[in-house]
Amino acid sequence: MKKNKLIVRTKSKTYPIYFGKNILNNKNLYNAKKICVISDNRIPKVLLNKLIKSLKKYQLKIYRLHVSEKTKSLTVANKIIDQLLEENFNRSDCIIAFGGGIVGDLSSFIASITKRGLKFVNIPTTLLAQVDASIGGKTGINTAQGKN
């Protein structure tokens, strides 16, 4: 049950990175009424169900995406944002990315532009996402002119 926290300090902000066992139940992690989980459809259902079970007290919206570079697009982002707005998500609510770098980039982009910024939690599931995409605050999607 040991939880570890690393504080990242940048020029513009400070934020925590939590790591360790059983951190999903950390109440300070979410502090929201509604949570949107955006997940890679290759994540085993048993793991997604464990996450969902830990969030049972929240109003949940779950997206399981077929992940490719085409997923990291304005079209996909707009569809999710429109649905979040229809469900009255607001700035006090949270988006959780549960997957690799593509899911993290898309989810953080959505969180950053919806209602001028929703809370964001990244649960990276690939090594590259753990050491690169989940640290540093990069948000981005691909465009017709190139990969972000």
Feature-to-residue mapping (PLM):
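Glycine/serine-rich anion-binding loops at beta->alpha junctions
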Residues: 93-112
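ATP/NTP phosphate-donor binding region
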Residues: 1-94
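Phosphate- and divalent-cation-binding pockets in alpha/beta enzyme and binding domains
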Residues: 46-47, 105-106, 130
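A glycine/threonine-rich phosphate-anchoring loop and its flanking beta-alpha core
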Residues: 9, 109, 114-148
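Hydrophobic, well-ordered secondary-structure scaffolds
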Residues: 77-83, 100, 113, 128-131
